[in-house]
Amino acid sequence: MMIPAWRPDKAMNIEAPEFASYVHQLEQVSGVTITKFADMVDALKKRHDFFQANGCKLSDHGIEEFYDEEYTDSQIETIFEKAMRGQQLSNLEIRQYKNCFLTVMAEMDADADWTQQFHYGAIRNNNTKMLNQLGPDTGFDSIGEFNTAKAMAKFLNKLNMEDKLTRTILYTLNPCANEVIATMLGNFQGGEPGKIQFGSGWWFNDQKDGMERQMNALSVLGLLSRFVGMLTDSRSFLSYPRHEYFRRILCNMLGNDVEKGLLPDDRELLGRMVEDISYNNARRYFKFY
């Protein structure tokens, strides 16, 4: 089964030179004339509905970090208008806008009963010379270091207080934050098993050591048996074998713990757990069928 996912990063990255041109493209595809931020939200809602009509059940947001800067509706409208005129935005304005944008998208996902994903912790396009020569996403990104725990907690808490915190998966690119996320999950669980998930190791951590570190942190501080397991980009179809790679690493970890006497030597119990992590948990969690 192949279904689309919702990735509205271009609407979030208000500081990008191509932001205004993207908004004009959004106007064309949505049929909504966009002169203010509220108009863009209306246009995105139409596209959100279109994605849902075509089977979409997940959103994904690529962010450097979480944001907690306070804002008002009038401030966001002013920031949006400045960006559309090509005016320079301050760092505070960018962060206010992104906080507002992610909140609006999260509320939209909650209303649609989607799962939201946040991939955070990358610093991108570090080599300007190569960016100018080859463009973005050509191999000049790296792991970032951000003090984001408080902002993450504040963001999730705000949604939770509004009853707008849908199923959420948090992915960190920096393994130093593994324990941060593993402990953050417990603050906002409720309503359904494993509602808030620690996402599998991704990008630079999408290898044996990275996968083991992520799963070890989750098993020590959370509940590994509720884990929804591995993921991959559908656009990178040749990377699908990483699911088999992941399953072998998972089984090896559990087998080693059995040999050390840390887990019961119960093939039925552990076999069912592996099946759940490999397939059943994700099927139930994402409500595919």
Regions from the language model: what does each represent?
Residues 1-115, 120-143, 158, 227, ...:
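Extended, charged catalytic domains and RNA/DNA-binding interfaces, predominantly
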Residues 107, 111-113, 162, 175-193:
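C-terminal functional module detector
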Residues 146-152:
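Divalent-cation-assisted or electrostatically stabilized phosphate/pyrophosphate-binding catalytic cores
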Residues 168-178, 203-210:
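Extended C-terminal subregions enriched in glycine
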Residues 69-71, 126-135, 177-186, 208-215, ...:
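Histidine/acidic-residue-rich catalytic or RNA/ligand-binding cores of hydrolases
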Residues 162-164, 190-193, 211-212, 219-224, ...:
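A structural signal for short secondary-structure junctions
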Residues 224-226, 242-289:
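Mid-to-C-terminal alpha-helical segments outside catalytic/metal-binding sites
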Residues 117-121, 169-173, 198-201, 224-242:
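Short acidic/histidine-rich active-site segments
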